[in-house]
Swiss-Prot record:
Specifically expressed in skeletal muscles in embryonic, neonatal and adults. Expressed in various types of muscles, including extensor digitorum longus, gastrocnemius, soleus, diaphragm, masseter and heart (at protein level). Not detected in brain, liver and lung (at protein level). This is Kelch-like protein 40. One of its GO terms (biological process) is negative regulation of protein ubiquitination. It is found in: Cytoplasm; Cytoplasm, Myofibril, Sarcomere, A band; Cytoplasm, Myofibril, Sarcomere, I band. Keywords: Cytoplasm, Developmental protein, Kelch repeat, Repeat, Ubl conjugation pathway. GO terms for cellular component: A band; Cul3-RING ubiquitin ligase complex; cytoplasm; I band. Residues 33-98 form the BTB domain. Residues 265-298 are annotated as: Disordered. It comes from the Eukaryota. Residues 274-284 have a biased composition (Basic and acidic residues). It comes from Mus musculus (Mouse). Substrate-specific adapter of a BCR (BTB-CUL3-RBX1) E3 ubiquitin ligase complex that acts as a key regulator of skeletal muscle development. The BCR(KLHL40) complex acts by mediating ubiquitination and degradation of TFDP1, thereby regulating the activity of the E2F:DP transcription factor complex. Promotes stabilization of LMOD3 by acting as a negative regulator of LMOD3 ubiquitination; the molecular process by which it negatively regulates ubiquitination of LMOD3 is however unclear. Signal peptide: none annotated.
Length: 621
């Protein structure tokens, strides 16, 4: 009678457990021990049968040297590592950590113990990070573990701009570098980043290392997709680079690329592989027609340097990023397509969002209760969007919870400006919190010249602008000031024509645009534009409807207006604030606002940012 799969598996596990527990018990009580493993000064009594059953390495040693099988001396391995390996063979238990995993991995490879090898591979894969990815990649290549090497390479490719800055990147061998930069999965927007990384690599190290790398440069260059480089960059940067000019072979390669830009492709002849002796004999018999059939025996291929396949990171598109407590959705106004970026519901309802010039997205706001902090348990959420994994990462929480504040960025720092305290007093704030993106720590920055909330904060050219809002007397302000982090000072600028709060604002075409909002007399539709160069405000085409909390977004040279609240009349004739989820676009030629969408899903309660995302990673909705 055939046993069911579950019953058969249960019986197998029972027998395995019985066998393993029995062997461990005999080891602990010194029964039937017939072998000693010596590592330095330490000895490990054990059973030859266990070692031979689990390791082809030990099995081969015992069979090759039967007379000395009672003692095994191991060199170039730590006693602690051997102790862990033997403990695993008898118990199936192993304690891995970042400090020991590489030594155990190497031991498992040397002693040919596939189970420990697989456990180490899984451990390293799960803990891949910027700090260890290059070391893990090299380890995978060294131990001939394709699974680990490919996982680490893919991790490196996905974060290439960051990894290429690491000093460990400069320590790669030519073959290791080629394995990375030849990948289609390289996450770079422009091939210029690959060229610059290769040049830094070739110029690093001592004189001997530089000479060796420069000899390998023609081979490495085959993996730089120079046809993707703009012609101007090719002529001004690549062709004139000292390392390129010093090698005629590299100059010939650059000329091939320039010819390709003009439509003249250089091809190489590559002999087709012969198929057995019959092909060879047939070729010999037809010696007289060799010249006429030469083309049949060869195939033409493009040199590697003429490869123009786009990298993975070159599929970035300009999108409007809508962030709400329901999730994050990216909208492509050019194609009228929506993409799901994240279904996470950890975004606080009342939040402020920011996109940096490096295209990093941050969210701050809401209330976070930290029960471990007895003195001041209340803080606010601070999250960063991970483009690669499409998820929100928890960052050090905002130490001072507040609402109606603004977010700005300059010089690797993020600024939380003004707002109102989330306390009974609801005091207006002039304080500015500063988050250092390099040290991942919060601190205090220079306070504002005045307390403000409901204002807008914009960033441009490493300066932080604060516009409008309401002061301590709850009156709307027309003030505008700018913070220069290099000088650690605030400076007041020309005031707006209309005092307002809760309005839309953005930097577009090198100028600051504001639209709609709340005034002391109610909602407004008025708009104005500020010339940064002239420090002057002028009127702009009014928005078609009076609104508060309108969002302005500058995307790919076009100015968009999204959402907000308007006062609408209900069927009963009552006027109530109503949230709108529409999209408008400003027509530069006709100087007017045009409706794009009457309503877009997922925009309710959202903040809007202009971002560049890789649509290959996103799911079309």
């Amino acid at each position: 009678m055939t046993l069911g799969l579950e019953q058969a598996e249960e019986q197998r596990l029972y027998q395995q457990t019985l066998l393993q527990d029995g062997l461990k018990d005999m080891l602990d009580h010194g029964k039937f021990l017939d072998c000693v493993v010596r590592v330095g000064e330490r000895e490990f009594p054990c059973h030859r049968l266990v070692l031979a059953a689990c390791s082809p390495y030990f099995r081969a040693r015992f069979l090759a040297e039967p007379d000395s099988a009672g003692e095994v001396r191991l060199e170039e391995v730590s006693p602690d590592v051997v102790s862990q390996v033997l403990h695993y063979l008898y118990t199936s238990e192993i304690a891995l950590d970042e400090a020991s995993v590489q030594d155990l991995f190497a031991a498992a490879h040397r002693f040919q113990i596939p189970s420990i090898f697989t456990i180490c591979v899984s451990f390293l894969q799960k803990r891949l990070c910027l700090a260890n990815c290059l070391a893990v990649f090299r380890l995978g290549l060294l131990l001939d573990c394709a699974r680990l090497a490919v996982a680490a390479r893919d991790f490196i490719c996905a974060r290439f701009p960051l990894v290429a800055r690491d000093n460990d990147f400069l320590g790669l061998s030519a073959d290791e570098l080629i394995a990375i930069i030849s990948s289609d999965g390289l996450n770079v927007e422009k091939e210029e980043a690959v060229f610059e990384a290769v040049m830094r690599w070739a110029s690093s190290g001592d004189a001997e290392a530089q000479a060796e790398r420069q000899r390998a440069l023609p081979t490495v260059f085959e993996s730089v997709r120079c046809r993707l480089l703009p012609r101007a960059f090719l002529e001004t940067r690549v062709e004139r680079h000292p390392l390129v000019r010093s090698q005629p072979e590299l100059l010939r390669k650059v000329q091939m690329v320039k010819d390709a830009h003009e439509g003249r492709l250089t091809t190489l002849r590559k002999k087709k592989k012969e198929k057995g002796e019959q092909t060879a004999r047939a070729k010999e018999a037809n010696q007289g027609t060799e010249d006429t059939k030469a083309e049949d025996d060869e195939e033409r291929v493009l040199p590697g340097i003429l490869n123009d396949t786009l990298r993975f990171g070159m599929f970035l598109q300009d999108l409007i990023f809508m962030i709400s407590e329901e999730g994050a959705v990216a909208y492509d106004p050019a194609a009228n397509e929506c993409y799901c970026a994240s279904l996470s519901t950890q975004i606080p309802k009342n939040h402020v969002s920011l996109v940096t010039k490096e295209n990093q997205v941050f969210v701050a706001g809401g209330l976070f209760y930290n029960e471990d902090n007895k003195e001041d348990p209340m803080s606010a959420y601070f999250l960063q969007f991970d483009h690669l994994d499409s998820e929100w990462l928890g960052m050090p929480p905002l130490p001072s919870p507040r609402c109606l504040f603004g977010l700005g960025e300059a010089l690797n720092a993020i600024y939380v400006v003004g707002g109102r305290e989330l306390k009974d007093s609801e005091d207006s704030l002039d304080s500015v919190l500063c988050y250092d993106r390099l040290s991942f720590k919060w601190g205090e920055s220079d306070p504002l010249p005045y307390a403000v909330y409901g204002h807008t904060v914009l960033s441009h050219m490493d300066l932080v602008y604060v516009i409008g809002g309401k002061g301590k007397d709850r009156k709307c302000l027309n003030k505008m000031c700018v913070y220069d982090p290099k000088k650690f000072e605030w400076k007041e600028l020309a005031p707006m024509q209309t005092a307002r709060s809760l309005f839309g604002a953005t930097v577009h075409d090198g100028r600051i645009f504001v639209a709609a909002g709340v005034t002391d007399t109610g909602l407004t539709s008025s708009s104005e534009v500020y010339s940064i160069a002239d420090n002057k405000w002028t009127s702009f085409e009014a928005f078609p409807q009076e609104r508060s909390s309108l969002s302005l977004v500058s995307l790919a040279g076009t100015l968009y207006a999204l959402g907000g609240f308007a006062t609408l009349e209900t069927e009963s004739g009552e006027l109530v604030p109503t949230e709108l989820n529409d999209i408008w676009r400003y027509n530069e030629d006709e100087k007017k606002w045009e409706g794009v969408l009457r309503e877009i899903a997922y925009a309710a309660g959202a903040t809007f940012l202009p971002v560049r995302l890789n649509v290959v990673r996103l799911t079309k909705m």
